Amino acid sequence: MRFCVSPNFYACPTDSINPVIPFIGCDTAMSQKIPTQDNSPNPVKIHQPDHDAIAKGRKIQSRSISGFFSKIRLSSMTFVILLYSLLPWVNWEGRQALLFDLSHQQFFIFGWTFAPQDFFFLSWLLMIAAFALFVVTVFAGRVFCGYICPQSTWTKIFMWIEHLTEGERNARIKLDKAPFSGEKLIRKSIKHFLWFVVAFATGFIFVGYFSPIRNLAPEFFTGTLGGWGYFFIGLFTVFTYMNAGWLREQVCFIMCPYGRFQSVMFDKDTLIVSYDSERGEPRGKRKKDVDLKDAGLGSCIDCQLCVQVCPTGIDIRDGLQFQCIQCALCI
């Protein structure tokens, strides 16, 4: 058997073992490409998220919606508001049921009384609460953020007032873009006045957890409260007004560490709100009776409704994001 040297291979036989197959020059045969067929699926155009949208400081105008998860969220937030507002007024054995009396260095929690030397038990209580929060996050995701977090709850109140005074989402956007007018001044003034009333009530009740609230009300309006009392009521009034009225979701994005912790507490079994890209992509408008397979479209019609109802202004279709508070309004 004779061999010839090929520039692409070490050697190839020039004598055919099978006499039926004619000899083809080694260099010529090896230089010809074997015909192939591309059987890969058609590429899917994936929507790329706008990561700079939050950094641009755009104002989020969410749309009102009703549904199963919306009703659950409203019920849980109503419970939180009522619990916060009414608990200081409850008496237990002739005194305020829940009172953190700093002046006398005593904490009253219903039938228990804690002195400074008992702070060890309060520390355990706080650690148990934190551990319970982490356990809930591992199994159910950020349901705390979406349903009972005070920041989300008070933001919901302020957004409801905004909807009441300025209208639905499109009307609010139109009002913000409109030039200054008497109607705009009246609507904005009423909104901020109601915001201030809610913020003041929140600050007043909060101070009532540290000073007997039944004495706090007459002392405040008669001017006998004292400088520190007025200071802290004013401080928490401004704090609530700014957080729920202006900062809103920015508190969750920047100031709250819990949103950052979620990435290390999630696993493959954690319940989260997510978008099924295999079913929804490629997204796009379509006619009513169009065949999705023939049109090369997924189930998502790209109506933007899931984005408009989101209180944090994210697009759930962009994948898992730390800004998502798992309120499930997009479902």
Per-range role (PLM):
Residues 31-284, 307, 328-331:
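Membrane-embedded alpha-helical bundles of multi-pass integral membrane proteins
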Residues 311-331:
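Structured cytosolic domains appended to multi-pass membrane proteins
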